[in-house]
Amino acid sequence: MTLLKWNLWALTFVVLVSCGGGGGGGGDSSPSNLEDNPEPELPQDLQTGIFTDAPVTGLRYEHGRITGYTDDGEFQYDANSSDPVCFYIGEVRLGCSVVGAIITPFDLSAPGQPAGLQSGYNITRLLNSLDVSDTPEISLSEETRRATGIITFAVSDAVFATDELVVDLVNRYAPEGVLLSREQASNLIADNADVQTAISNLNQVLNESVSGITIRWNGALT
């Protein structure tokens, strides 16, 4: 092989290698080989919300990596986060809600369940029963932070009143040792505009659901 032919062959080889062997045309630039580039997370936008039945002090809350206890109803949340905010008496979860400036017991729901009137009233009954303050606001004692267990709030008034954990919490931490009735709880929240708005919204959803139900009579049953 002459020197000229050798140089030409070597030059051709180098060109082919630099082009990826002549096949596939720069394989690393194909879409299937590009690294995923997810959108960067939005910066944290801390806001202050209010949990109100009356404003409650001493509720534990969790919102993503943000945790703490409410102070006169106030809690912190990230307005850029899609995580729900959940509220607890100790380790007893009352429910969770989409974050917002105002949250009431009637905005809370159990996982996989919508917010409801019955659960809202039962949460209100329990919170007001455990109130140790002599002011219009609600204050939970530090002892309630030791509470553990699970309560189902979406049950009838009577069933809720006989729930073992509810009875235990009332016996341990309620100043009067008595669970308030639904009527008593309703009177306490009657003048809270935020709570009444939440109740009105739930009633509207309920009415719309009922109006959409079609009843068909079966003539064979008459």
Segments (PLM) and residue ranges:
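Feature for extracytoplasmic/surface-facing segments of secreted or surface-associated proteins
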Residues: 25-72, 76-222
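An acidic-aromatic pocket/loop used at catalytic or ligand-binding sites
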Residues: 12
